[in-house]
Amino acid sequence: MERLASHLSEWLERQITGGGGRGAVVGLSGGIDSTVVAALCKRAFPRHTLGLVLPCESDPRDARDAQLAASHFAVASCTIDLTAAFRALGREVHESCSEVPADDRTTTANMKTRLRMTTLYAFANHLGYRVVGTGNASELAVGYFTKYGDGGVDLLPLGNVTKTTVRELARHLGVPARIVDKPPSAGLWRGQTDEDELGFSYEELDAYLAGERGPHAAAIAELVAASAHKREPAPLAPAPPA
């Protein structure tokens, strides 16, 4: 695991400095992925890593775990509660357009992640940093991220690392057990977990990605196909014929 940790932290340093960046900013959710990414960023940029804790109608325990992650790895951090901004935007959207119902949970949840993205980039722009994403290979494969939300980042160090390997890497890096052992959650609403929403475990998903076909293989294949657009850049219309 040390070889992987060194490879990823060195890659971060090369990618960011090679593109003119001064450091890294990462959103700290209190989960395993963001904690691992913060630890890798701290290795790459010991003096120029910033973690942002961005609660938005969130479980207070997640913010506490995010702050634990920051203190454990000595990552400078700020906490910005986006709840008021989110509610104001939600009211404006729903009151201005009746076609967007206020009880559309998916749309509402995606608005949260896009507010977080906007906040991360505000800090990155000001500091000359790059936004480092926390998505892993398992999530990317089935599109378990918000387009231009948590998917709106500059770099994805875990983009080729499955959730199973992220857990191993977390233990190697010394991520607190409380964070390693908690059920994975995007924090979109109270009690939400990744595996409940997906309908299968990360272990089965990672086995599928390794070529095994379990009882949820068809459902996984369907998600992979349906989310292809999320993994591709916006298509460009061809120039008109001369």
Q: Which residues does each predicted region cover?
A:
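Catalytic nucleophile loop
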Residues: 34
